[in-house]
Amino acid sequence: MSSSTQLVRAVIPVLDLMIGQIVLAKAGNRDEYRPVETPLTFSSQPLEVAKAMFNQTCCDWLYLADIDSFAGASPNWNVYNELLNHGFGLWIDANWMIDDRYRHIHEKIESPERLEIILSSETLSSLDQFSTFTQLIEKGIQPIFSLDRKSGQTITQPGELSELAPIELVKEAYNRGVRSLIVLDLDSVGTMKGIQNKDVGVGPLIQEIKQELSDLRIISGGGIREVEDVKSLLDAGCQHVLVASAIHELKLTPDDVMEFPVSPFDLGSGRSLN
């Protein structure tokens, strides 16, 4: 296995960072986020929560949403570096389009070899901005495109993207070199309402994307309540599933997670090796 190849478990624990603490997200309503209360740890500090979630799942790659950045605050570089320096791999969503802050990643991040950058649809307004994916790849940073959905619609900034079908946005990112995609129903986040089957919610969209672009690494989540929900998304074509509440509610154990496939992923090319 080459030095750029990472083994990534199917479950990706989620950290929502707000005012220096980990909060529990619910249905994408950021005004209602509160510091996490979890039996895993007495702390809401990022590193302590990350270590506690690792102890519960044995998953060392994390999805980190920097909530304050979406209100215009600067990225929390200190937290990113603290987690990376403790051996975690990070997928970071930090509204990278504001002031072209993605251009500062190399000077701010101390260990970029276990870092992937998420560009979410809600931060993009034009097709021209998709060139950012290419720029990141040229700098050796693997981007992930996040297709954010709410009330059955894709969330974008006002502009031409709001007129495009989800599959068109995904294809545009794919044509710019993206090989990892998040499909996320924000209405389901933090609700633990479960995944019914592959024919509802984001299921049909995931199937459409897999048929069109079979080599995409697809990630989804939202509403996960138990092991069977993780299995449902994996069966629908996902390689990874984002989970927060179910971990804090002790619905997933290390033994559960070990039963799911591990995906070798080449950070150099951005491709899943399965």
Residue map of PLM features:
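Short catalytic helix/loop segments, enriched in acidic residues and glycine
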Residues: 29-51
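Catalytic cores of alpha/beta
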Residues: 89-113, 117, 126-133, 204-240
